[in-house]
């Protein structure tokens, strides 16, 4: 099916296809709607807005054909190039997104938790995200204060605060999770 590239988003106008994408993996968000539970999807009559990470992932999997404003198909490599051009650390962050998606997790924005991603086992409205993921730039450190802040945040929302990075030498995704424990 088709999505239309608009800036750094891809719009899926075909409502039936949009519903299917959302039901199958909670991809994107419906225009004008905040949170939509799986059993409410059939009532939605709005386009689906996909972020660049989601659109690239679906295009690489052959589930989505992205069309540019000029009417020509935008290849996954071109989507990645656009991301690199407009977003800092695009390749590393996409690799982390893809890592979780390939493991079967649902990956949504973690902005409301001060994180890059919220990662669900089943999906929003079905379960709570067990972890929030923060991107740590390769070769950069993190302060003890930042770790404490992340740990406190994750404790208050009952989630594992997870640092994620990509090793420059191997391209491997590395995760480090923090949680609170009563001693």
UniProtKB/Swiss-Prot annotation:
Keywords recorded for this protein, A-Z: Lyase, tRNA processing
Active site feature: 120, 128, 159
Sequence similarity: Belongs to the tRNA-intron endonuclease family. Archaeal short subfamily.
The keyword tRNA processing appears for this protein: yes
Top-rank taxon: Archaea
Assembly notes: Homotetramer; although the tetramer contains four active sites, only two participate in the cleavage. Therefore, it should be considered as a dimer of dimers.
Taxonomic source organism: Pyrobaculum aerophilum (strain ATCC 51768 / DSM 7523 / JCM 9630 / CIP 104966 / NBRC 100827 / IM2)
Entry-linked InterPro entries: tRNA_endonuc-like_dom_sf, tRNA_intron_Endo_cat-like_sf, tRNA_intron_Endonuc_cat-like, tRNA_intron_Endonuc_N, tRNA_intron_Endonuc_N_sf, tRNA_splic, tRNA_splic_arch_short
Gene3D superfamilies: 3.40.1350.10, tRNA intron endonuclease, N-terminal domain
GO cellular component: cytoplasm
Function as written in the Swiss-Prot or TrEMBL entry: Endonuclease that removes tRNA introns. Cleaves pre-tRNA at the 5'- and 3'-splice sites to release the intron. The products are an intron and two tRNA half-molecules bearing 2',3' cyclic phosphate and 5'-OH termini. Recognizes a pseudosymmetric substrate in which 2 bulged loops of 3 bases are separated by a stem of 4 bp.
Keyword Lyase on entry: yes
NCBIfam families referenced in this protein's UniProt entry, alphabetically: endA
GO terms under biological process: tRNA processing; tRNA splicing, via endonucleolytic cleavage and ligation
Any GO MF annotation of the entry: tRNA-intron endonuclease activity
Protein name: tRNA-splicing endonuclease
Enzymatic reactions: pretRNA = a 3'-half-tRNA molecule with a 5'-OH end + a 5'-half-tRNA molecule with a 2',3'-cyclic phosphate end + an intron with a 2',3'-cyclic phosphate and a 5'-hydroxyl terminus
Top-level taxonomy: Archaea, Thermoproteota, Thermoprotei, Thermoproteales, Thermoproteaceae
EC top class named in words: lyase
UniProt EC number: 4.6.1.16
């Amino acid at each position: 099916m088709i999505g239309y590239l608009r800036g750094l988003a891809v719009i899926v106008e075909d409502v039936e296809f949009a519903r299917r994408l959302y039901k199958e993996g909670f991809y994107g968000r419906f225009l004008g709607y905040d949170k939509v539970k799986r059993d409410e999807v059939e009532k939605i009559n709005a386009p689906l807005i996909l972020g660049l990470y989601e659109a690239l992932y679906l295009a690489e999997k052959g589930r989505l054909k992205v069309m540019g404003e000029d009417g020509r198909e935008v290849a996954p490599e071109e989507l990645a190039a656009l991301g690199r051009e407009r977003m800092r650390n695009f390749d590393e962050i996409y690799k982390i997104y893809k890592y979780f998606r390939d493991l079967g997790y649902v990956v949504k924005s973690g902005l409301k938790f001060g994180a890059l991603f919220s990662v669900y086992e089943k999906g929003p409205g079905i379960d709570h995200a067990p972890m929030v993921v923060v991107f740590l730039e390769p070769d950069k450190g993190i302060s003890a204060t930042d770790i404490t802040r992340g740990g406190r945040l994750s404790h208050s929302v009952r989630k594992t605060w997870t640092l994620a990075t990509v090793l420059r030498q191997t391209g491997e995704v590395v995760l480090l999770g923090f949680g609170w424990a009563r001693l």
